[in-house]
Structures are given as C-alpha cells and as structure tokens.
Amino acid sequence: MTESVRLPAASPKPSTVALPGSKSISNRTLLLAALSDNVCEIHSLLKSDDTDRMLEALDKLGVQIEHLAEGRLKVHGTGGRFPNRSADLFLGNAGTAFRPLTAALAVLGGDYHLHGVPRMHERPIGDLVDALRIAGADVEYLGNEHYPPLHIGKRQDCGERVIPIKGNVSSQFLTALLMALPLTGQAFEIRMVGELISKPYIDITLKLMAQFGVQVANEGYRVFKIPADAHYHAPEHLHVEGDASGASYFLAAGLIAATPVRVTGIGANSIQGDVAFARELEKIGADVVWGENFVEVSRPKGRAVQAFDLDANHIPDAAMTLAIVALATRQTCTLRNIGSWRVKETGRIAAMANELRKLGAKVVEEAEAIHITPPETPTPDAVIDTYDDHRMAMCFSLISLLGVPVVINDPKCTHKTFPTYFEVFSSLTETAE
C-alpha cells in the first residue's frame, strides 16, 4: 500500500527556514573536487538520494572522501584521473550525477557500466553521447538507443577540437561536456546546435568551474571555449549555497498566505538562476526583501495574487511551484517554454495536469506549455499522486494553504533533494481545522 501524508488546511506563521544545500551545486562540486589536484573541504553539502549516488560512485572510482560532520566532508582530488579504471555505477534517478559522470568517464576512458532506476533509462542522453563520440569517446548503449544504461570504453583522440551539441532537451548535457573536456588538457570549442534551454544552470557550471581554476569563454551562449592546459585546482574550503529550487515552496507560502516567510542560505548574490522565482512572485503581488544570505516574501492581506503568463525557460524547476500559485489567483494562468518538464523525474506536464484536475482546476496541456484555470475552491482531501518526483510532492503541499486539506502519496520521494521537507513545512504552519 502506498504511504501517504494528510496535510490539514493550514496557514504559515511568520517563519525563517534554513535551506538544505543546493543539489545542482552539491553534485557539481563533488565531481570537480574529485577531479582536482588538491584537497577540498566542502561545507553545507546536501544530504539526499542524489548526492548519495554521486558519493557512492566516487567511492567506487577510488576517490578518498573523509566525512567530517553532517554536511561537511573533505575530498582528496585525484589530479584528473580516477584511480579505478573499471567500475559498475548505479546512479538511481540522479541526472546531476549520471550526465556529468558519463562525460568525465568517457573523456578519461576505461571500462565503466552506468545504470539507474527504470525512469533514468527513459531519460534521453543521446545528444550528450553524440557529442562525446565526436570527441573520440567510446560509449555504447546497452538498452534502447539514445538512453541509458551505458558502457564506456577507452577514448581515442581523433584530433577533433570543435564539438557541436544540442541544448534543447537538457542543459545538463552541456554542463557535462563543459566539466569533462578540461580533463584532456586540450583546447576545445563547444558550439550549440539550436536553442539552449535553462541558461542559468550553465551559469552555475561556469562559475563553479572558475572557482576550481578553469575559465571558460562564453560567447553569447552559442560558443564556449575551453583553454589548453586547463586543470582543476580546488579552493581549500567551499560553502554550498542553499537550494533555490527548494526555497520556492516556502517563498510561495509567504505569497499565498500573506505571511512573511524568510529563507536563509541564498540571497541577492546567489549563483543559482532559481532565485529569479522571487522576482516573478514580486510581479504578481509579493513584497520581496533581499539580503546577502536571505530572501523574504510576504503580501499585504488586501492585495490579490495576480494571474500570470510567463515564459519559464529560466526557472524550469521553480516554475512547477507557480503552477500551484495559479490556484490562488482568479483567472487563467499560463507557463510557457517548459518542454524540459517532459524529460525530468517524470513527465511533469502530464503529471501536473492530472493532479491539478483532481483539485477542480481546468487544465490545457501543450507540448511546451500549460494553461491553468483555478476552481472557486480546490477540492478538499484530493489524493495527489507524486510519480516518484520530489518536486510534485513539495509543490502540492502548498494546497493546504488554500483552505483545504490535501493527501500526498509517497511523501518520501522528497528524499531525492530535501529529506526533511514535510517536517520543515509542518513546523511553519498552524492548522486551521
């Protein structure tokens, strides 16, 4: 029987939430530290299923990692060459581990088998593999063409230094290639073919690579130039920012319930694109206060939440939260340019539409968009399926702030990025029943 949690109708108290570390930054940092030529102490690392999969993989690859305290560990860099040249790596459903490790191992070469849960084997990787093969990598599909699982063999340098790659399915493919090619010591030029989605995630990658000593020239997100003789050198200490995508639920709570909610761990100078979510809330009725290490959202009780029509390409994960915010408005809301939702942890456009309809919303799905017309009052005690997708579970918790109880199936799927989410969410709410 599926485990579930019932959230009673509630309203948040004025609250402060300390965010867990960013998944995007945590897994990038772990891999870059492992490939550096020195030792790096990482602070505030996210503890989650996805980071556990990366840590397990690095251990199997021979990387020495000292666990010092919760959220703090010391990574002994390998100088850009993993000690173990053969390994079987299970990476769950962690795209932030699977894609970058695929590229790094393909560039270094060896005898590696990479696989995951069934959903990971439905998430495309062909555009990345195509680019790696142009760079001389030996990557073989072990199941369906263009999808994991994969076998990686020895790379043969064919002398090709201009690598085209598509960026319209997932920006993680470009991230993986950017992080891997410096391991060759050769100068490379990566050229985008077609549109690049989710550019803010590429900004995270480039800023972290710079912190690890590799400066990539970004020519308008069309061409990326990797210098010759590049190598990774880690900072002695690196602090992981709080998770900006995870912040979206609490910031939305402040807007929906017209109560000040502050998150700490991110701020005005965050390197994560999803901090732009707060700016989108500001456009539809929120008051936002920015600090160096916090963001606070509230709303005057007499001010309505405004409907929106948003191109959400820049905040694809946080945009899911806006789909719930739509129910706090009185008109049809639209999220556009969200085609990447279809290749995430689940097919998110269809999943979101299915569950919003259970609440009485009228929903129109398109290939790259979703249109949501809110009901007068959401259906109470709707049973929400989460599709083993952490963001579905966290998003729909906000329904309890709209005056009705809601039942969330499989709440433990939040362990992917935010294991304590429901405890934290409950701690900042007062039951209205």
Swiss-Prot record:
Annotated positions binding phosphoenolpyruvate: K23, G95, R123, Q172, R348, R391, K416
Main subcellular localisation: cytoplasm
Biochemical pathway: Metabolic intermediate biosynthesis; chorismate biosynthesis; chorismate from D-erythrose 4-phosphate and phosphoenolpyruvate: step 6/7
Reactions catalysed according to its record: 3-phosphoshikimate + phosphoenolpyruvate = 5-O-(1-carboxyvinyl)-3-phosphoshikimate + phosphate
Keywords assigned by UniProt, alphabetized: Amino-acid biosynthesis, Aromatic amino acid biosynthesis, Cytoplasm, Transferase
Record GO biological process: amino acid biosynthetic process; aromatic amino acid family biosynthetic process; chorismate biosynthetic process
InterPro entries noted in UniProt: Enolpyruvate_Tfrase_dom (IPR001986), Enolpyruvate_Tfrase_sf (IPR036968), EPSP_synthase (IPR006264), EPSP_synthase_CS (IPR023193), RNA3'P_cycl/enolpyr_Trfase_a/b (IPR013792)
Subcellular location: Cytoplasm
UniProt keyword Transferase present: yes
Single GO MF annotation: 3-phosphoshikimate 1-carboxyvinyltransferase activity
Active site (UniProt): D317
Enzyme Commission (EC) number: 2.5.1.19
Residues annotated for 3-phosphoshikimate binding in this entry: K23, S24, R28, S170, S171, Q172, S198, D317, K344
PROSITE patterns according to UniProt: EPSP_SYNTHASE_1
Any one GO cellular component localisation term in the record: cytoplasm
Function: Catalyzes the transfer of the enolpyruvyl moiety of phosphoenolpyruvate (PEP) to the 5-hydroxyl of shikimate-3-phosphate (S3P) to produce enolpyruvyl shikimate-3-phosphate and inorganic phosphate.
Family membership: Belongs to the EPSP synthase family.
The protein's assembly and partners: Monomer.
Name this polypeptide is given: 3-phosphoshikimate 1-carboxyvinyltransferase
Source species: Neisseria gonorrhoeae (strain ATCC 700825 / FA 1090)
Lineage: Bacteria, Pseudomonadati, Pseudomonadota, Betaproteobacteria, Neisseriales
